[in-house]
Amino acid sequence: MLISSRIVRSSLVNVPLRLSRCFTQAHRACKEEEVNSPLSSAAEQPEQKYTHFGSKTVLKSTKQKLVGDVFSSVANRYDLMNDVMSLGIHRLWKDHFINKLDAGKRPNSTTPLNFIDVAGGSGDIAFGLLDHAESKFGDTESTMDIVDINPDMLKEGEKRAMEQGKYFKDPRVRFLVSNGEKLEEIDSDSKDIYTVSFGIRNFTDIQKGLNTAYRVLKPGGIFYCLEFSKIENPLMDFAYQQWAKVLPVMGSMIANDYDSYQYLVESIERFPDQETFKSMIEKAGFKSAGYESLTFGICAIHWGIKV
């Protein structure tokens, strides 16, 4: 069974792309004293400065480099890594992701779409979206920004484009090194479709990344995310946990890289469950947020609409 839907939301693509009561004075004074105390400041400090890197706690300022090192290490074996981690099913998930979004300039439209694929250095999702738009709608005008913080991953995407002979040096396609939490090079209200596939869990600040996605999308634009998630079936979850214990060992055997695979397993474990991530999408300002769990919840498609 490939797909197990928790939420069924028909015709996603038909959605137009277009404190509390006061405390007493004494209680307030007490609270102010607590907030201003050194103990209170010390307690808040770790939350401000630290984040997780897999199962480890690290300074926020260092996580970007640590994650970058992981993906530089696996860049030239990225497809192999995904095959190992998902037993090859990631290819079916990605196909479903692209088909469900069903994006492209319709024949009766005069306005091409502006896509942005974040953490998309390998190019597989971006090129798949453009292929779908052309094959189904005859769309050869929509544009694609392929964004990744890691130059090594973008090189793999450019290599893929050159090997396929289709999108290499295509004026519609731009490869851009940029931090997905900021996207400083991308104008606000400029994109119709924002996609991110198996990448957002590696952000230092996921909520900040979601807020930025909302910023760069036009009103009516769609946020669309494919990410590992939380398994809903207890037996399937047990089987997956056993598999996860073996993955770093396989990474060592296949790619001579135990540590990177160990981090990737731990990053999946730390990512929010489906409902929590849906709430984060809504917190960023998106409406009509929803999700579809795939393969018992091993991964999920999440979406939201900017209104």
From Swiss-Prot:
Top-rank taxon: Eukaryota
Pathway, per record: Cofactor biosynthesis; ubiquinone biosynthesis
One cellular component term from this protein's GO annotations in UniProt: extrinsic component of mitochondrial inner membrane
Enzyme Commission number(s): 2.1.1.201
CDD domains in the cross-refs: AdoMet_MTases
Transit peptide: 1-19
Key words, A-Z: Membrane, Methyltransferase, Mitochondrion, Mitochondrion inner membrane, S-adenosyl-L-methionine, Transferase, Transit peptide, Ubiquinone biosynthesis
One Gene Ontology term from the biological process aspect of the record: ubiquinone biosynthetic process
Subcellular location: Mitochondrion inner membrane
Pfam families (alphabetical): Ubie_methyltran
Recorded topology in the membrane: Peripheral membrane protein
Further information: Present with 8100 molecules/cell in log phase SD medium.
Assembly notes: Component of a multi-subunit COQ enzyme complex, composed of at least COQ3, COQ4, COQ5, COQ6, COQ7 and COQ9. Interacts with COQ3.
Protein's job: Methyltransferase required for the conversion of 2-hexaprenyl-6-methoxy-1,4-benzoquinol (DDMQH2) to 2-hexaprenyl-3-methyl-6-methoxy-1,4-benzoquinol (DMQH2).
Protein family (similarity comment): Belongs to the class I-like SAM-binding methyltransferase superfamily. MenG/UbiE family.
Name the record gives this protein: 2-methoxy-6-polyprenyl-1,4-benzoquinol methylase, mitochondrial
Organism encoding this protein: Saccharomyces cerevisiae (strain ATCC 204508 / S288c) (Baker's yeast)
